[in-house]
Regions:
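Conserved, single-site charged/polar hotspot
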Residues: 1-317
Length: 317
């Protein structure tokens, strides 16, 4: 099977300032250096001309591009703007009165950046391998879901309405012009800006093409780097359906010896929240935290470590 290319939405703004670090091909000419585009009269204004979309294709494998003022950590405590650099193709399209910058690149190259953006590139090799498989599975599960909805000419919409309640699920399927976004809403993807390592590249290459499967389908492998000591049912978080491999479990070693209390009971839930139950996340080992978390994830002084919510017993053989 040929490695697929994926499209990642990076930034959406009225004006976008970027730099082509090498030779790129666009609108019949070779261009490089500093560039500026602006939304104008329903199109993209670049070098005095209006376009519906623009594609900048690298002329060699070493060419990259940098986008300025990219917001990361949207609505998180560490939200900030960065200059980020990327390999691959840069595509600019008009979307709802703004310009969206999209990076198109091979899936495995995308994963190398995801691992270094979500977690720290200094993490252990086996940890990085597990992350590569989980992130790859999540990515392809979303692409398959998006394709299925497109084939049926359906959009993502999931809600329950009763006389007293209106419950709406908001997932990442609201992306219609690219496969995934670059922030925590999907998976963090910060291009080649984040320091990578030989171990990250080895982890992705060693697991190339490996996916988590369940009943001949790709697992929708949701994951988190912090928790409250227990995982939640998929259907209460993402969509009105449940998967056996994304069920509620105790997030701790020797799970079978540490039964999870019934957190649907108010008194049990309050006790759980107000105390510090034994869990993978409950660590104060600064060495471990600094090894696996990027700097901005350590700015809020709480105990968090990486832990995936896929139950081990449901991993495919």
């Amino acid at each position: 099977m040929k490695e697929p290319e994926i499209s990642v939405g990076i930034v959406n703004a009225q004006e976008i300032h970027f730099s082509l670090n090498g030779n790129f091909f666009a609108k019949g000419e070779t261009v490089c250096g500093e560039q500026q585009v602006a939304f104008s009269e329903g199109g993209i204004l670049w070098n005095g001309n209006l376009y519906r979309e623009l594609t900048f294709t690298p002329q060699d494998e070493h060419a990259s591009f940098s986008l300025y003022d990219v917001t990361i950590g949207i609505n998180f405590h560490w939200e900030r703007q960065e200059t980020q650099s990327f390999m691959g193709t840069l595509k600019l399209v008009v979307d709802e009165g703004k310009i969206t910058a999209i990076n198109i690149l091979p899936a495995e190259d995308y994963l190398i950046s995801v691992i270094s953006s979500e977690m720290n590139a200094t993490s252990s090799l086996e940890f990085l391998k597990a992350h590569a498989v989980v992130s790859r599975s999540w990515l392809f599960a979303q692409i398959e879901k998006r394709k299925a909805l497109s084939d049926k000419n359906e959009g993502f919409f999931s809600f329950i309405k009763t006389d007293t309640e209106y419950i709406r699920w908001y997932d990442r399927e609201d992306h219609t012009i690219f496969d995934v976004c670059a922030d925590d809403h999907c998976q963090r993807y910060q291009g080649i800006t984040k320091a990578s390592s030989a171990a990250v590249t080895e982890a992705v290459r060693a697991t190339r093409g490996q996916l988590l499967m369940y009943e001949r389908g790709i697992c929708d492998a949701r994951f988190s780097k912090c928790c409250g000591g227990a995982s939640e049912e998929f259907g209460y978080c993402w969509e009105d359906k449940n998967y056996p491999y994304l069920s509620t479990i105790r997030d701790a070693e020797e799970e079978e010896n540490r039964p999870l209390p019934d957190l649907t009971k108010e008194e049990e839930a309050e006790r759980w929240i107000r105390t510090s139950p034994v869990s993978f996340c409950d660590t104060h080992d600064k060495k471990v935290i600094s090894q696996i978390l990027n700097n901005y994830d350590q700015e809020l002084q709480i105990s968090i470590v990486g832990k995936y919510v896929i139950p081990k017993q449901n991993y495919p053989n």
